[in-house]
A protein has these predicted regions:
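Conserved class I S-adenosyl-L-methionine
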Residues: 89-96
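Conserved SAM-binding loop of SAM-dependent methyltransferases across substrates and taxa
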Residues: 99-110
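A short acidic, Gly/Pro-enriched loop at the edge of an enzyme's catalytic core
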Residues: 142-154
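Conserved beta-strand signature within the Rossmann-like core of class I S-adenosyl-L-methionine
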Residues: 193-203
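Substrate-binding/catalytic lobe of Class I Rossmann-like enzymes that use SAM or dcSAM, i.e.
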Residues: 204-326, 338
Length: 342
């Protein structure tokens, strides 16, 4: 699938720059097939859009906030400030742009904002909003020289949690994949742009998870155990979390860690807002219920796992609970090492 004039379609064409706000970039050359499990994850999560949930990342909340979006907007503004998107004309790449909320905020600042995404549903939604978004993986950019040196900054807001799979860990490729991701961010940034940065948000764990546990059927693991919860998360969410400190090592020689903020509490609050909205939708929105029924008919195992993980065992919210939560959400700002060779 490729983007043609903003829509996900079946033949490659050059994306048309419809205004001065857009960048004349071709559809990236397909190199890596998007993970089927990650694509399915977002196909199923698209059902939540019926309940008005279009923002799946963390937030930063104040006591007076009343909605999910209050904290998410504050978090997005923080990320844009960190990457340097403060002046009109800033060229921004958003890797894993979701439903485009960050792109809209960047455009409101006068930026020329571009997104890449592996979810056809989200790409089409963004395109309908007039956003410049391409259906591809971030790794496709490595083999697309027209994209190299085109941006003043890059953001990956939660997407890197999908980039490594348990099979990659078993094969000893985890650090290689993370290092390559920093090389790609380095390559697409304009070497002549001043003071450039790459900003990421990602869940981390204190100790590496056993990939065999994640690949094992979750229902074979003890109920309530950390092993079962993380296995549930993988079978629905499809990914593998980096260990604290791992990305800093993998960023070399391309980037140096400049700033790190713990956003775990904000993710917990955002997840509680989403849970309340979804539960309310189950009782008040027949379209949401029907969407879940259709998902069960099309993808019974993965949808049932999603329901078990999210509503019954609440593994998603579990990872943020307690005095020492099982995961830590880090917002990290990386400064480009201009002398590094990519």
């Amino acid at each position: 699938m490729y983007v043609v004039e903003g829509k996900a379609h079946g033949s490659p064409h050059r994306a048309k720059a419809e205004s001065l706000e857009q960048m004349a970039l071709p559809q990236p050359n397909p190199w890596i097939e998007p993970s089927k499990s990650v694509k399915l994850c977002y196909t199923l999560m698209h059902v939540a859009e019926i309940a008005g949930i279009r923002d799946l990342a963390d937030g930063e909340y104040k006591p007076h906030d009343k909605t999910l979006e209050d904290g998410i907007d504050r978090q997005i503004n923080y990320l844009l400030d960190q990457v340097g998107c403060t002046q009109p004309g800033f060229r921004l790449l958003d890797i894993g742009c979701g439903y485009g909320r960050l792109l809209k905020k960047a455009k409101a600042r006068g930026a020329r904002a571009v997104g890449v995404n592996v979810s056809a549903e989200q790409v089409d939604y963004c395109s309908d909003q007039g956003l410049q978004v391409y259906f591809c993986t971030y790794r496709d950019l490595l083999g697309s020289p027209e994209w190299h040196g085109q941006f003043d900054g890059v953001i990956a807001n939660g997407s890197l949690e999908h980039w490594v799979q348990p099979e990659d860990v078993k094969a000893g490729k985890m650090n290689e994949i993370y290092n390559e991701s920093f090389a790609i961010a380095h390559k697409v940034i304009d070497p002549d742009a001043p003071d450039t940065r790459y900003v990421t948000t990602a869940l981390h764990v204190k100790h590496a998870l056993d990939p065999e546990d994640l690949l094992m059927p979750w229902y074979h693991l003890p109920r309530g155990s950390n092993r079962r919860q993380f296995s549930l998360l993988h079978h629905w969410f499809s990914g593998y979390y980096p260990v604290l400190g791992q990305l800093e090592a993998c960023a070399k020689p391309y980037f140096s860690l400049e700033k790190e903020v713990d956003g775990t509490l904000g993710y917990k609050i955002a997840s509680e807002y989403r849970m309340a909205r979804m539960r309310r939708g189950l009782y008040t929105n027949p379209k949401l219920v029907w969407g879940i029924v259709k998902a069960l008919a099309r993808h019974p195992y993965t949808t049932a796992t999603l329901l078990e993980c999210y509503f019954i065992e609440q593994a998603w919210d579990w990872q943020f609970r307690g005095k020492e939560p099982p995961t830590t959400l880090l917002r990290q700002t990386w400064k480009l090492n201009s002398q590094a060779s990519s």
